[in-house]
Amino acid sequence: MEMKHLLKIIMVMALTGFMSGCSELEEIEERGFVVGAAYDIVKEKKANPIMKGTYQMVLPSKLSQQGGQGGGDSENYINVSAKADSVFEQIRIIAKKISRTLFFPHIQVIIFSEELLSHPYILQNTLDVYIRDHEMRRNIRLFVSNKNAEAILKQSAKPENLPAQYIDMLAEHPPKNAQMIEAARIGEVQEKMISNRSFVLPILELTKQGVQMNGAALFRGKDNKCVGNLSGEETVGMNYIIGKKIGGFFTIRKKNQLITYEIHKLRRKIKVSTTNATKPKFDIHLSLEGTLAELHFSDHKKVLNEKRLEKDISEEMEKRIQKSIKLVQKKYKVDVLELGEVYKRHNYKEWKKVSKNWDQGENYFSNAEITVHVHPTIEHSGSALPKRVK
């Protein structure tokens, strides 16, 4: 894990400084190793709004005392904040408050409040300082908080004892949960902003137990404004379309029946027709391989078999995916489904004619015909199906 690697580096540096002399140790102690940042809106302005930037710093002395592990009577980090309309100004203000210099090369996570990112260009402007710094890593993970972003960096994170580390670890779970999207890296987001492509970022929510990743924030390509979000359930449909989710569970609940289908493999094939360049047709075929994780039914007289169960799974999954499509295509009108890229590869000549009005201007994306066909296969059912069901 990147964060664990960072903690080891800081601890080794601190111990090395102690062994080699006071001057090097003092230099390390004077640095505030920033591992996470959070940005919230404070005051509306015509141009850039006033933001509150919160920076989580690791304390090398605490790490060396604890042997690099979480625990102890005190936290091994501090959060420092400042209010300004730019990151540089916030850093300047913080420099007057504390004795440490903020050191950013090892930052792992940046969290924005959804309210802040509802303003055009704020994401791009705020990330600019991170992108321009040649010492900054390109794999910083980006998140959106559905409420206060600072609160995410304050939540209890034991046994990790570093909220930023805990958030970084959460991002490892998406392959097992289709209600979460894959972690977004700053380098990937920069590429999409440069090419004016719409994109998504994972949403963080505070719960009684701590923090969870659930759902997706939708960003418009032309001005990287957050135009809305998808719930965890709605995110499932999007994940299957873009073909980046190969795991997770899909549950169907009917009157007297519950089916939980565990997906192990997903293959996607998209057929495109650009006969009408401004109203293309996309036929999306999803071939799934999985097993029955759970099956409940009370009508024992009703004879079910694998084909019938596969049909039920197919119909319900198509229904939910079409619901997700309707939201992003008709309500938010942003191509986070990446169908523009499919169009581009299929017919580059026609794509050049419509690209500037794909999901902006005339917004041809919102009028495209998108149909989904789900082909599930139940593997190794064995004793999972009662005799009457097989």
UniProtKB/Swiss-Prot annotation:
A lipid is attached at C22 (S-diacylglycerol cysteine). It holds the Pfam family Spore_GerAC_N. It comes from the Bacteria. Keywords: Germination, Lipoprotein, Membrane, Palmitate, Signal. The keyword Calcium does not apply. A lipid is attached at C22 (N-palmitoyl cysteine). Belongs to the GerABKC lipoprotein family. Contributes to the L-alanine germination response. This is Spore germination protein GerLC. It comes from Bacillus cereus. The gene is gerLC.
